[in-house]
């Protein structure tokens, strides 16, 4: 029997009304205005005959720079801003990108022998107009905001860049060995240096901006060094269970009162995740230990001028479970957008972690007479955990390109290095980072030793002093501004979906860490309690901070972007809730420690 036409028309009208209701819900959220920190026009060229803005605190990667790392022509940056705000393809194509070209070969003229010998080409800015795109679900990319980023002269920025230098100097440290005697000297040095900074040793004051207060971290200890501050991130082992463990495989099941285990079923905790009838390994390629990049000034300047060094890194044979800071930096170099959260979802599903009891049809089938799949089941959460990712990216691209345009940490390291060397020439070239140079004294001396060793290994027998931030990636940062972080905003959105669907309060019965000697998991000595929500929060922090460990983001980039991604996911859940006929709610523990119902 067919469906009567009047019923079809009624259904079409109800569908239309639901879409309108979702649009009205999005509209009624309002718009939060975005404000930058004012640095773009604050800093000026020191030459009294040319007091144009220097744009030294802005993202200028790709534009031509002088020998100190400042852009040569401020008009290039102004044209860049106009083009990205218009989104016009021709305007963007007409921008100045990279250095002058050789009239005979047509190749860019680089400063370093390395870039010239490789005949490198330039790389272009990445999706600079993505924040201008409209979407059909969730908050509009321009309707939510991030607070102003810390300024170059602030104690917070000094603390952020100090932390990045220390992470870079400790890339071979194993996460399970932070408290090992063999690492005691480095770990204690890092703790002492951070605790000696105003940002870590001075409490927030009445009148401080709320965003600054929530980012402020207290005393640094072995237990919280380089960790995030989301609920659960400081509990238990550094690495989230969901980035190291595997899952139950097909061939392992309980039928009636019998547990059937195939003799060929992979061990649940060997780092192999069931992806249907195939498996995904949690193991990562092993980047060459001790190999850092952009430690030479000429190479650094070439990268700022758009030299495309992507793919120039090197690896050892094989792969292993994440063990070191460098391993985590490598993981976040090549991950496939929502990879970590899809993997976590597969682990949760395969290991039988229950959905939130407030969702429909969570009783036994004999009581509900139906099981979940398309709605409120595996198909639903597997789709939605990936669906939110690009919506979150569009929101953060708007903040990156159209609002804040914050310089990347590598560029801050460039300013610091030039200024650290400048007194030898009797001048301060970038007084805006004088505080950082002073406060990071001992850290910079260790960075110089590390950079010298790297530059000698790269073929320079007598390298000039270099206080640059050692980078884990040959190409340095991605080709878009620093604030906020794409990895972090996706982490915030995807983890929010997982916490909304699964029973987040469930305790994890067995805790694992990566063995310090062999490529295997071992039971952790941690005696406390880990929960699903805490380990999902920790997963988000691990991925976001992994980018900091590579040298491409600051702590504030990561933290504020996690919160932005959470907003995107909540908006999508609110709108999709209008489409269901069942009476239910999502119970969501938020990143600020509160719980809401959607």
From Swiss-Prot:
<feature type="active site">
    <location>
        <position position="487"/>
    </location>
</feature>
<feature type="binding site">
    <location>
        <position position="487"/>
    </location>
    <ligand>
        <name>vanadate</name>
    </ligand>
</feature>
<feature type="binding site">
    <location>
        <position position="370"/>
    </location>
    <ligand>
        <name>Ca(2+)</name>
    </ligand>
</feature>
<keyword id="KW-0560">Oxidoreductase</keyword>
<feature type="binding site">
    <location>
        <position position="400"/>
    </location>
    <ligand>
        <name>vanadate</name>
    </ligand>
</feature>
<feature type="binding site">
    <location>
        <position position="365"/>
    </location>
    <ligand>
        <name>Ca(2+)</name>
    </ligand>
</feature>
<feature type="binding site">
    <location>
        <position position="553"/>
    </location>
    <ligand>
        <name>vanadate</name>
    </ligand>
</feature>
<dbReference type="InterPro" id="IPR036938">
    <property type="entry name" value="P_Acid_Pase_2/haloperoxi_sf"/>
</dbReference>
<feature type="binding site">
    <location>
        <position position="361"/>
    </location>
    <ligand>
        <name>Ca(2+)</name>
    </ligand>
</feature>
<keyword id="KW-0575">Peroxidase</keyword>
<feature type="binding site">
    <location>
        <position position="408"/>
    </location>
    <ligand>
        <name>vanadate</name>
    </ligand>
</feature>
<keyword id="KW-0479">Metal-binding</keyword>
<feature type="binding site">
    <location>
        <position position="486"/>
    </location>
    <ligand>
        <name>vanadate</name>
    </ligand>
</feature>
<protein>
    <recommendedName>
        <fullName>Vanadium-dependent bromoperoxidase</fullName>
        <ecNumber>1.11.1.18</ecNumber>
    </recommendedName>
</protein>
<feature type="binding site">
    <location>
        <position position="363"/>
    </location>
    <ligand>
        <name>Ca(2+)</name>
    </ligand>
</feature>
<feature type="active site">
    <location>
        <position position="480"/>
    </location>
</feature>
<comment type="similarity">
    <text>Belongs to the vanadium-dependent haloperoxidase family.</text>
</comment>
<dbReference type="InterPro" id="IPR052559">
    <property type="entry name" value="V-haloperoxidase"/>
</dbReference>
<feature type="binding site">
    <location>
        <position position="485"/>
    </location>
    <ligand>
        <name>vanadate</name>
    </ligand>
</feature>
<feature type="binding site">
    <location>
        <position position="368"/>
    </location>
    <ligand>
        <name>Ca(2+)</name>
    </ligand>
</feature>
<dbReference type="GO" id="GO:0019806">
    <property type="term" value="F:bromide peroxidase activity"/>
</dbReference>
<comment type="subunit">
    <text>Homododecamer.</text>
</comment>
<feature type="binding site">
    <location>
        <position position="547"/>
    </location>
    <ligand>
        <name>vanadate</name>
    </ligand>
</feature>
<comment type="function">
    <text>Catalyzes the halogenation of organic substrates in the presence of hydrogen peroxide.</text>
</comment>
<keyword id="KW-0837">Vanadium</keyword>
<dbReference type="InterPro" id="IPR016119">
    <property type="entry name" value="Br/Cl_peroxidase_C"/>
</dbReference>
<dbReference type="GO" id="GO:0046872">
    <property type="term" value="F:metal ion binding"/>
</dbReference>
């Amino acid at each position: 029997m067919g469906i009567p036409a009047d019923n079809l028309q009624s259904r079409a009208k109800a569908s239309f009304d639901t879409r309108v209701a979702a649009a009205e819900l999005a509209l009624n959220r309002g718009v939060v205005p975005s404000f930058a920190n004012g640095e773009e026009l604050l800093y000026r060229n020191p030459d009294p005959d040319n007091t144009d803005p220097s744009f030294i605190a802005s993202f200028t990667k790709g534009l031509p720079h002088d020998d100190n790392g400042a852009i040569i022509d401020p008009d290039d940056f102004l044209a860049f801003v106009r083009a990205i705000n218009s989104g016009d393809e021709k305007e963007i194509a007409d921008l100045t990108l990279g250095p002058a070209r050789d009239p005979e070969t047509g190749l860019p003229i680089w400063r370093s022998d390395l870039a010239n010998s490789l005949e490198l080409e330039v790389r272009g800015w990445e999706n600079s107009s993505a924040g201008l795109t409209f979407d059909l679900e969730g908050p509009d990319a321009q309707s939510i905001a991030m607070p102003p980023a810390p300024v170059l002269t602030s104690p917070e920025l000094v603390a952020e860049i100090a932390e990045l230098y220390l992470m870079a100097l400790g890339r071979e440290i194993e996460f399970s060995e932070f408290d090992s005697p063999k690492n005691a000297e480095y770990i204690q040095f890092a703790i002492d240096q951070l605790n000696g900074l105003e940002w870590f040793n001075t409490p927030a004051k009445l009148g401080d901006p709320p965003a600054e207060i929530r980012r402020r971290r207290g005393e640094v200890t072995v237990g919280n060094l380089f960790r995030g501050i989301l609920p659960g991130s400081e509990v238990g082992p550094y690495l989230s269970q969901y980035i190291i463990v595997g899952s139950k495989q097909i061939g392992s099941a309980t039928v009636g009162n019998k547990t059937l285990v195939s003799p060929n079923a992979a061990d649940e905790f060997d780092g192999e995740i069931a992806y249907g009838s195939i498996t995904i390994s949690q193991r990562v390629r092993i980047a060459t230990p001790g190999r850092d990049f952009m430690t030479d000034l000429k190479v650094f300047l070439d990268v700022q001028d758009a030299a495309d060094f992507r793919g120039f890194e090197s690896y050892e044979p094989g792969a292993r479970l994440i063990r070191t800071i460098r391993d985590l930096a490598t993981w976040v170099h090549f991950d496939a957008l929502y990879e970590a959260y899809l993997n976590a979802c597969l682990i949760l599903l395969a290991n039988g972690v229950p959905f939130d009891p407030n969702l429909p049809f969570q009783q036994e089938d004999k009581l509900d007479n139906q099981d979940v799949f398309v709605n409120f089941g595996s198909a639903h959460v597997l789709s939605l955990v990936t669906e939110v990712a690009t919506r979150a990216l569009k929101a953060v691209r708007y903040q990156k390109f159209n609002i804040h345009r914050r310089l990347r940490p590598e560029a801050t390291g460039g300013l610091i290095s030039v200024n650290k060397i400048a007194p030898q020439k009797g001048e301060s070239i970038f007084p805006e980072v004088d505080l950082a140079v002073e406060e990071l004294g001992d850290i910079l001396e260790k960075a110089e030793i590390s950079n010298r060793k790297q530059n000698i290994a790269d073929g320079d027998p007598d390298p000039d002093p270099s206080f640059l931030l050692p980078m884990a990636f040959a190409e340095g940062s991605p080709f878009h501004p620093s604030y906020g972080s794409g990895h972090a905003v996706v982490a915030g959105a995807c983890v929010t979906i997982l916490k909304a669907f699964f029973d987040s309060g469930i305790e994890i019965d067995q805790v694992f860490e990566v063995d310090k000697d062999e490529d295997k998991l071992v039971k952790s000595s941690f005696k406390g309690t880990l929960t699903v929500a805490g380990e999902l929060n920790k997963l988000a922090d691990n991925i976001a901070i992994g980018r900091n460990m590579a040298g491409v983001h600051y702590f504030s980039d990561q933290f504020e972007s996690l919160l932005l991604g959470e907003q995107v996911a909540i908006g999508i859940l609110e709108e999709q809730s209008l489409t269901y006929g069942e009476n239910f709610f999502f119970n969501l523990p938020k990143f600020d420690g509160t719980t809401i119902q959607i």
